[in-house]
Regions:
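Non-catalytic DNA-recognition/assembly elements of restriction-modification systems
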Residues: 28, 143-197
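Polybasic, glycine- and aromatic-enriched phosphate-binding surface used to engage nucleic acids
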Residues: 1-150, 173
Length: 197
């Protein structure tokens, strides 16, 4: 949505790849920032000049294929991004091998992992949601070397060509869950809580 507002990234550059932003190339931005000279000139987190942001170790990650997810919510939905989207600090990102990222999205958006995360995550917030720390995911043992059909099914889901139920069944099959185990997860109130919201 274009509301006439823009985020201006006066970055400090990326070593040997991208020069820092020269504020003199953007006179309107410089004029605006000059109003705050007393504050920006004395801040401790500046880049090479007071106009530049400090170095961001993961700036390049935003231009890579990645998984993005909100940190807090009743339903933590994971999305696969290949469009170089940039997010704020209420969203975490993960980069890696494209097929592994797609599989990760499928697993994490499945009812199996929705159930698992709600069962094992202790950081519950008001309203029944959870706060999903990166450290929680780091401790979650995930198999991400499934056969190509799972990757293809998840990719089709990303493009709205199949349903969530199709992905759920593929994940159940990948983990060899019995019909009884599948039914248990599908009927658990934690999985279905706020699913329609």
């Amino acid at each position: 949505m274009d509301n006439g507002l823009f985020l201006i990234n006066t970055h400090n550059g990326i070593r040997n790849k991208l020069p820092r932003i020269d504020i003199n190339d953007y006179p309107a931005v410089k004029t605006h920032l000059d109003q705050y000279w007393d504050r920006i000139s004395t801040r401790s987190d500046k880049g090479d000049t007071p106009y530049n942001l400090r170095n961001c170790a993961y700036l390049e990650d935003f231009s890579k294929p990645k998984v993005m997810w909100k940190i807090i919510g009743c339903n933590i939905n994971f999305c696969f991004d290949e469009k170089q989207l940039i997010c704020n600090n209420a969203v975490d990102i993960m980069t890696g091998d494209r097929d592994s990222l797609i599989q990760f999205v499928g697993l994490m958006n499945s009812k199996l992992f929705d159930w698992y995360l709600k069962l094992t995550t202790e950081a519950e917030v008001q309203g029944g949601g959870i706060q999903l720390y990166v450290t929680t995911l780091e401790k979650t043992l995930l198999k991400l070397d499934f056969q190509q059909p799972l990757t293809d099914i998840v990719y089709q889901r990303i493009h709205n060509q199949v349903t969530d139920a199709t992905v759920d069944m593929a994940v159940f099959e990948a983990y060899n869950l019995t019909l009884e185990e599948q039914a248990f997860i599908m009927q658990d109130k934690r999985v279905n809580k706020n699913r329609e919201e």
